Swiss-Prot record:
Region ranges (G1): 19-26
Name of the protein this chain belongs to: Elongation factor Tu
Protein's UniProt keywords contain Magnesium: yes
Function comment: GTP hydrolase that promotes the GTP-dependent binding of aminoacyl-tRNA to the A-site of ribosomes during protein biosynthesis.
The gene coding this protein: tuf
């Protein structure tokens, strides 16, 4: 059989393994890299279990997370795959967004069925906006009973449905160890799993396709020319002479026109997501704009003051608080480029939150911030990060 020709311009998808401890997340990751390496050697490196399991520590917004990144290619796509070995690491990663996932492989051991962490991981995936989950039913080499497999599959589908995931998602029976040992039946099961990823996980929406948004980092005046703002374009594309809206932090938003776009001292016609750009804004004074506001396509974004968030509170060892906090806690919420004070309301029945906990909270900010669901923030006290979270719902 002729090897499939690989295209260099394949769509890129971020993916990860989630599921209960000891159900085989890391072994599954290792099996995927080995099987793809054996199938398409030019495009893929094999990663051994140990290399993935002993993940280097990463710092994301001041939080230390053990997380492993591997990459691989199928015929259709290029994947970046994250595997967070520990349960606490997984939670921290999901909430701080050290790695965004476009889809997840939920690993469930056929010998156990769904366990408490399986449920918790699916719930968290829903809260933090992982768009799609499919299932690798692992350790199938250890189960001879077809009825038992069907039962486990049913339970997993119920669990997905509970969190509004696709109840009809692929559930692929695999044996990660069998595949690593080279047993052809299980090697094929991993190829089947990857085919399911290719076909079921939707192509991610690219940041450039969304309406233009750039957080303001710096402002300065160029004598005789006007006010320039700089920042990194977060979303969309901006063209020269486009009308933009400046919003957030202040009561009213302002409209203006971009009369020049510069990057690395070169004049450009456009700036797009990922670019560090300097924009010259027509008719604006230095005091008309401040750090923490956003420059955006008019009407595309709205500032809000009240929201709900999913938050991980740093432990003392991570440089967080040494003591719990209570209802009406008033820290700073750091969105994009600035701190805004907010008042915290804890959920009913929660009297206090300990360092190291994760919690759902309602927040009322004293100044509006342009936000939508999924926006990440840090919680700070005097410039020190004590928590990390993301917006799960906007209330006002």
């Amino acid at each position: 059989m002729a090897k499939a020709k690989f295209e260099r311009t394949k769509p890129h998808v971020n993916i990860g393994t989630i599921g209960h401890v000891d159900h085989g997340k890391t072994t599954t990751t290792a099996a995927i890299t080995k099987v793809l390496h054996d199938t398409y050697p030019e495009q893929n490196k094999a990663f051994a279990y140990d290399a993935i399991d002993k993940a280097p520590e990463e710092k994301e917004r001041g939080i230390t997370i053990n997380i492993s990144h591997v990459e691989y290619e199928t015929e259709k796509r290029h994947y970046a795959h994250v595997d967070a070995p520990g349960h606490a690491d997984y939670i921290k990663n999901m909430i701080t967004g050290a790695a965004q996932m476009d889809g997840a492989i939920l690993v469930v051991a056929a010998t156990d069925g769904p366990m408490p962490q399986t449920r918790e991981h699916v719930l968290l995936a829903r809260q933090v906006g992982v768009p799609y989950i499919l299932v690798a039913l692992n350790k199938c080499d250890m189960v001879d009973d077809e009825e038992l497999l069907e039962l486990v599959e049913m339970e997993v589908r119920e669990l997905l449905a509970e969190q509004d995931y696709d109840e009809e998602a692929p559930v692929v029976p695999i044996s990660a160890l069998g595949a690593l040992d080279g047993d052809q039946k299980w090697v094929d099961s991993i190829l089947e799993l990857m085919k399911a990823c290719d076909e079921s996980i939707p192509d991610p929406e690219r940041e450039t396709d969304k309406p233009f948004l750039m957080p303001v980092e710096d402002i300065f005046t160029i004598t005789g020319r006007g006010t320039v703002v700089t920042g990194r374009v977060e979303r969309g594309v901006l063209n020269l002479n486009d009308e933009v809206e400046i919003l957030g932090i202040r009561e009213k938003s302002t409209k203006t026109t971009v009369t020049s776009i510069e990057m690395f001292n070169k004049l450009l016609d456009t700036a797009e997501a990922g670019d560090n750009a300097a924009l010259l804004l027509r008719g604006l004074k230095r005091e008309d704009v401040e750090r923490g506001q956003i420059i955006a396509k008019p009407g595309a974004y709205t500032p809000h003051t009240e929201f709900e968030g999913s938050v991980y509170v740093l432990s003392k060892d991570e440089g967080g608080r040494h003591t719990p906090f209570f209802d009406n806690y008033r820290p700073q919420f750091y969105f994009r480029t600035t701190d805004v004070t907010g008042v915290v309301t804890l959920p009913e029945g929660t009297d206090m939150v300990m360092p190291g906990d994760n919690v759902e909270m309602s927040v009322k900010l004293i100044q509006p911030v342009a936000m939508d669901e999924g926006l990440r923030f840090a919680i700070r006290e005097g410039g020190r990060t004590v928590g990390a979270g993301r917006v799960t719902k906007i209330n006002k």
